[in-house]
Amino acid sequence: MSNSERNLETLPTGSLGIIPLQSCQELGEKVDKYLVKWRDERQHQHQNDAAFMGYKRDSYIIEAVTPRFGSGEAKGMIKETVRGYDLYLMVDVTNYSLTYSLCGQTNHMSPDDHYQDLKRIIAAIGGKARRITVIIPFLYESRQHRRSTRESLDCALALQELVAMGVDNIITFDAHDPRVQNAIPLKGGFETVQPAYQFIKGICKNVPDLQIDSDHMMIISPDEGGTGRAIYLSSVLGLDMGMFYKRRDYSRIVDGRNPIAVSYTHLTLPTTS
């Protein structure tokens, strides 16, 4: 029995619904087209059961908008019912191309604006959905994952806030520090997808003269935070690894951080056979 046949023995949680926010509209449409084609081509013995009603549709996208008032404030609106749905909300908090008018001035949307729009749509759902999953490719405030002085832990607060609003699962990609899921250890599911395979695949497909050997290629981490990923890639490909680290001046603080004192320093770590 194939995996697809075996998985269909499990009843759907609810009718599938995709809500791509304005920041993730294009990606949401691609996902929708893939799901429509995939489900249309699948055949299984339970497709006529009542539990699978609405399994095949022309589109799974549910229209939702976040219009703004002249003051710059906004509200979330869903154009159709989502009662009993298995909803997937998609948001790209790093999409700076979107703008809105504030007191006659044009403002670009910041990650804070996108996150607030996400919460507005969750609030508009009003707890009527069967399950809510948030897909956020770049985890909101993921760089603020630890406290090194008197500062806020924004990423942990955001995760706790989403769970408190009824979010069941949070899916992100290559989180800055996956240990931030300690903020919600017992509530909700937190998944961070590592893109190492897609990274290697993309390089191999787009660089025709690539030579993956220690004489022509090495893996370099741009800072200390990326060493884990660099170690994994260099180990898999059998390449040498290098890294840069910042030599900071800890006697001064400029714009809230210690400035780089001299320059970036490079280290090379050869592979062992």
Predicted regions and their residues:
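PRPP-associated nucleotide enzymes
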Residues: 1-267, 273
